[in-house]
Swiss-Prot record:
This is ABC transporter G family member 42. One of its GO terms (cellular component) is plasma membrane. ATP 1 binds at G173, P174, P175, S176, C177, G178, K179, T180. It is a multi-pass membrane protein.
Amino acid sequence: MTMSQTDGVEFASRNTNENGHDDDDQLRSQWVAIERSPTFERITTALFCKRDEKGKKSQRRVMDVSKLDDLDRRLFIDDLIRHVENDNHVLLQKIRKRIDEVGIDLPKIEARFSDLFVEAECEVVYGKPIPTLWNAISSKLSRFMCSNQAKKISILKGVSGIIRPKRMTLLLGPPSCGKTTLLLALSGRLDPSLKTRGDISYNGHLFSEFVPEKTSSYVSQNDLHIPELSVRETLDFSGCFQGTGSRLEMTKEISRREKLKGIVPDPDIDAYMKAASIEGSKTNLQTDYILKILGLTICADTRVGDASRPGISGGQKRRLTTGEMIVGPIKTLFMDEISNGLDSSTTFQILSCLQQFARLSEGTILVSLLQPAPETFELFDDLILMGEGKIIYHGPRDFVCSFFEDCGFKCPNRKSVAEFLQEVISRKDQEQYWCHIEKTYCYVSIESFIEKFKKSDLGLELQDRLSKTYDKSQTQKDGLCFRKYSLSNWDMLKACSRREFLLMKRNSFVYVFKSGLLIFIGFIAMTVYLRTGSTRDSLHANYLMGSLFFSLFKLLADGLPELTLTISRIAVFCKQKELYFYPAWAYAIPSAILKIPISFLESFLWTMLTYYVIGYSPEMGRFIRQFLILFALHLSCISMFRAIAAVFRDFVVATTVGSISIVLLSVFGGFIVRKPSMPSWLEWGFWLSPLSYAEIGLTANEFFAPRWGKITSENRTLGEQVLDARGLNFGNQSYWNAFGALIGFTLFFNTVFALALTFLKTSQRSRVIVSHEKNTQSSENDSKIASRFKNALPFEPLTFTFQDVQYIIETPQGKKLQLLSGVTGAFKPGVLTALMGVSGAGKTTLLDVLSGRKTFGDIKGQIEVGGYVKVQDTFSRVSGYCEQFDIHSPNLTVQESLKYSAWLRLTSNISSETKCAIVNEVLETIELEEIKDSIVGIPGISGLTTEQRKRLTIAVELVSNPSIIFMDEPTTGLDARAAAIVMRAVKNIAETGRTVVCTIHQPSIDIFEAFDELILMKNGGKIIYYGPLGQHSSKVIEYFMRIHGVPKLKENSNPATWILDITSKSSEDKLGVDLAQMYEESTLFKENKMVIEQTRCTSLGSERLILSSRYAQTSWEQFKACLWKQHLSYWRNPSYNLTRIIFMSFTCMLCGILFWQKAKEINNQQDLFNVFGSMFTVVLFSGINNCSTVLFSVATERNVFYRERFSRMYNSWAYSLAQVLVEIPYSLFQSIVYVIIVYPMVGYHWSVFKVFWSFYSIFCTLLIFNYFGMLLVVVTPNVHIAFTLRSSFYAIVNLFAGYVMPKPNIPRWWIWMYYLSPTSWVLNGLLTSQYGDMEKEILAFGEKKKVSDFLEDYFGYRYDSLALVAVVLIAFPILLASLFAFFIGKLNFQKK
């Protein structure tokens, strides 16, 4: 509030005297003191009244508002905005009045777009557009041969319009009509690959004249956030990077003009404006303001979380996405479906605040919504209605109904206008709104509507305004942004560093766990190589070389988790980069620098553990130098994996490239293949491998030590002789050259990381693929909607009753938290029940408890099905549960998903023909016929849209013929028409006599009144109403109207919105009643208890439902169905299977080239070591890649498995056996690739026996590593921990493979680990089958020995043990597969 000086003092005096504090003179003197201070101080100084947590105010005093602590800010906002509905409007009015009093014009933006066309290019394939292995290969070949077909799809088709300031515009339209594309285009965020024509301007300025990404904000449909950060931290960082815009300059100007005019502002408004204008601070008052108006205060300090980590709810995450954008100074907002997952009351509150912001702050706002309630719809000033990429109507909201009445269509009474608008343009729903009875109805196309609008007064006025050039002289450039970044380079670097450090603290468990594993592996290594260096001869020098290589390999593999961690954050980085929060270098530098202490610690721990115990040269200087090399190598390796993640970004592809990098670095590192043994034309590989420089540095540090200075017969020191044999003798000075090279590699990889983040395209959805056949068909299917769900399969109608249900969990702080409090009710056959309440009331929790899905917590109360205590196995068979989150196998089609569900959930006495008929009927009922051959895909990346995925979730449950169906928010994410389709089907299902319960958030009038009964809940899991709705919701309205002070329901308003509004916490406080207690004391509650008891007694008269088995199908049918699904999933997953086949081919080719024909001539031990090195390379690295890539594939399907297992679709053994068997054909193919490429190129001996052994050993290797990767997934809670354990497994199987330390030299206390390591048996079988029967004499370490004797003496391999090796090799995959099957059935990491 602003006023004259006297009024201002009087206001402040009244405000303070009520609390017994300052008088007028003291306040005036304080204000005068502020005005006398320098400008830079005055702008951060205000008269601030501190408050305690009880709300008690202290004396108002002069304070620096930039130094307010968290409690001060929170209590200040709580005092300013006690009730969001009213107080936010008052606050904005006071701010606007203060601005107006000094004559400042607020900057504003008018966004115009004219003849805007947007086209996308898609790939045309013959047959179904399914990404199979064959399609992937043929697509790559066709692109290579430039013969691929491409088709352009028009997304926006010549749209024009004006988004005006001080007004809020609603964007409506059916799915795929171009709403998101229009929002992206107007905000300057369209993908560059899209072809755009037309003009877009802000205040007459084209996008090339300013920075649109900083002038406007786009609120995405996708909730991308860093899961480790809290809600407050997410908003603080967003606010910090966005800066304060013109707030600071405006506050300075207001202060200057007020001083000249002698105006004393409201102290609280002055403090708020100054605190919100502070730049570069870690926290800002604006964060607390946004938390308050979005209703996020309750979870402000809760971490965001994700699928594998607990966090905030989906609705809270949606609000956080909105808050992240509006916390900054930008006033032009393009918001995409911001109400998904929110109840209608919360949506109304948020949009009310946005409306107040638009009108009082002159903001420009365009919002797309799916199902706006009538009250929410009326908040908007203007409306844009879209269809088929065109704008049908663009004008004032008030005139849209009259426009369509002129076209012959009228919105019925008690029909949501938004719902009417989306259905009237649909061919399938249009006819019901035809109002010209005297005329025969004929379908009015979208083109006809557009033509009529263009000829209307509104259309002509719009064209007239667009034809006039915007007068730039009227433009306030403060509204446009001409800088990419709000902060200085140094401030951006500090902010990114602060966030990176915080994330490292939040992930401290991962780093501690990783360091613990490193200590564990280090302990094993030092005891395996115990005092190896104490004997100085060429043989022990070879062992010492093995220990050095193992150290290097361990630190190399230790960097792999950095790859997965980086990929997991790439999506959030890309979003924030597009928003111009910061440049890539500001993100890359802290990522690199703050990991230096981790590298330092892990390298030091390894060196400290192993150096003196293994027996390296004991000088302290050499200890430090070895540590420095390992430190530099570790830095370069984690930098390399970061760079790979930034370049490739896809999990499977990046993991495969990471594995290839390990292969290349290891093979060219100078140990597996000696430098002299490399082909001369491939020696460049040696000089490009960081591992070779580390090898040079470590060996120079060790073998130029005095203790290796003994002169040999060749007149060289023993150390030089050892280095010469390996081709590593580059002189003593080579150590520092190697160290410098490793630092250079670190800098190079970090530069690549930064450049990749800067210049490579942002991660996006996969390229659209369409079928050639479908492309020739009409896009509109005229099939009728099934008016009835005609499924006539027999089922048992069941009553579900529950009494005094309580659910209590223990918080991390050890406190008891009650989420459900004495909930009592009944779900009856043929009755459609709605479960409603504000976000966080416990609706989903109640469904989870009643259905038996909770995995922790204490459940009390009585739950009965059919009058008998619920038996979970039986209940899972006869019930269906549509989860809030749509979890499906990504590589099946829509029809196959339904077929799979019907196959396993319908009993075996139902014929296949009947099952197919049911599947087709459900496809028709839920309107999935047109997309039945579409791949489900991964949410946000490929496949179905959100609303299609939601309909699939419902369809999958319907085909199971359940007696009881629970649906958790079945209409969330659907537009009004799709929601109506779904609810029509649900209503028809209930009318067949089934028991149906749905939780709902923001239903339209029609959807809400389709329900028969309502259970209304409040926070704390308490029921405040349970009973019938009545015609036009009369019963529930009558119940709440009895409460004194409840406002009447306005005519044509949505009863659901009204109910949520009057039962909100703030409304309850105003009324001064406890609605839950009022319900428990009501006559309705007593009547309900009697009805529930009668229902129980009636049900008890019937027979108890007993099923003959836990599953609908036999074990054999379960296995067949699971194998069918897994086969399709694998065949359609080229990113997994094609990638690992390519990797195997690459590794084999590399080995073939490096070891060309080396197996033919074996004359000394080094020749044998070369051949053994080729075997070791293929075995270890092909295994590593298979293990790494299978993790993500199995982890994706694990969530689907949890859902399907709960529904008793199959036994875990049937699922796991199918998962195990489906890997075999791909492993067979990889093994064949190995034999075809490696065998002739390396020059192995040709015989059926030897070829078979090579094939058999590699085949078992691949299965072992595949099954171990699958086992890792099922015994760990998330992929990140699985990846960390994986790298330690690689180190162990490397150490005990018999390559870096042969079996005879392994200490007896570790020999059992040799026998437990699968790689030791594989290498035994490969080498012994090739050379175990060879009697040729070779020179081995100065002695002549037969090859077979050398194998036994040096490696411990015996030819007569091959039969045992063969048995053990097949036993390993069988054991691992059995463990996988056991643990996937026993462990459940899904916390509910």
